[in-house]
Amino acid sequence: MLKRILVAVMLFVGASLSGVQAQIEVDITRGSDTPLPIAIPDFKAGPGAEELARQISEVIRNDLVSTGRFKTIDPAAFIQKDLSISLQPRFADWRIINSDALVVGEVSLDSDGIVSTVFRIWDVQGGELYRLTVRDSATDQLVESGGGNFRINKDDWRRIAHKTADAIYTRLTGDDGIFDSRIVYIAESGPKTNRVKRLAIMDSDGANQVFLTEGRNRILTPRFSTSDQEITYMSFEGGRPRVYLFNLRNGRQEVLGNFPGMTFAPRFSPDGRSVVMSQALNGNSDLYLMDLRTRQTRRLTDHPAIDTSPSMSADGSQVTFTSDRGGSPQIYVMNTDGSPLTCPSGGQDKACRITFGRGNYSTPVWSPRGDLIAFTKQVRGKFHIGVIGTDGQGERLLSEAYLDEGPAWSPNGRVITFFRESRPGAGPKLYSIDLTGRNLRQLQTTTDASDPAWSPLLK
């Protein structure tokens, strides 16, 4: 019995235990190797905001370049220097240096410590102003505007840079941004035989890294709620794996139910009102759904095989999970209400297998867009991060390494973060990759790091 429970936990943690036609837009789904040339001069600074303007401009440039979809023009090449938020730029000067888009902005700092930015995005080739969809602060309605503006406390100045970068990214790609968000992960330190694992959090670009726990107990697989203020994770506190909630507002931790056996592999439902998880009892692992308000649970699977690593679809109607009911770890999909569904094979069942390739599949996670499921695959001695359609079609492997594990989606469903060990004995590091399999980047952390999870865009 203990052996089957340990296998269930290993399946769950995977290998870690071993616009207008004339306007320019970026298509980020076709895998183009040519990034959009964009000029972002330092924003003009009001009194006392000179350093803030420089820093905010730098973060905006770094955010956009980090996606691999933009190339910033070297400021040394700029011809026009007398830019103003209220004046049309000399487009010919920017065409000469091959810029397709131009961002002009201003930063001010008032006596109450509030930072404000105002910016415009210009289509250099089309010779016109990009219109932005913004939320009117008076009516709370979305309206079209010739530019964007944000206000925030000085201590949170990086957020105003990320928000501005998100607005630029959204206007030029057509997709939601990802920069004004956070990543929670497991910070690892110490020798392999006595590893200290702490819950940690940072901005999407690696800034403002903070440890949330002290590392007295082993912690795995943190996951964000849709409110971005709660994290669920598995901890070995008390000597057995159990699912916990961590409140980011007050730092309070609590056990999610006093279940017999072990609970692990937690993940929030899309509406944030429930947590789906695995429970191992009497040698068997099945899936359960807990209502966070009533703390009532409902059993989702009842099968002698190991069912683990559940993840709900964007609309909450379905669950994907890993099961060895077919003889090896594979990915399955079921309806959340337990009703039968039509499988890719044409028959009906309560759970349909959607992976049939060589190797073992684990850690499936549904895209927030609803169209893809990311997974870890082990085949021929290598590990891969991949994606597959929810109907089992179009499997694509995006990465390959000695160990790649734990995929997690960006808020817009266009980027996947995961952790990698490049060789035996190497500590885990966080990486991200886009859906084209390009733009593989290491996310810098102060320690070794594993089990990343991306928050929604911050409120």
Outline where the language-model segments fall:
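Residue-level detector of Asp-centered blade-edge/turn motifs that repeat once per structural unit
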Residues: 177-179, 226-227, 270-271, 314-315, ...
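Short beta-strand->alpha-helix linker/helix-N-cap micro-motif
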Residues: 27-90, 103-109
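A flexible loop/linker signature enriched in serine peptidases of the S9 family
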Residues: 176, 188-198, 214-217, 234-243, ...
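Amphipathic beta-strand/beta-sheet edge segments enriched in Tyr/Trp
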Residues: 24, 85-167
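Blade-level signature of beta-propeller repeat domains, shared across WD40, Kelch, NHL, RCC1
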Residues: 428-459
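Short loop/turn segments that connect beta-strands within beta-propeller blades
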Residues: 203-207, 247-251, 291-295, 335-339, ...
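Hydrophobic beta-strand positions that form the internal "hydrophobic ladder"
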Residues: 183, 231-232, 272-275, 316-320, ...
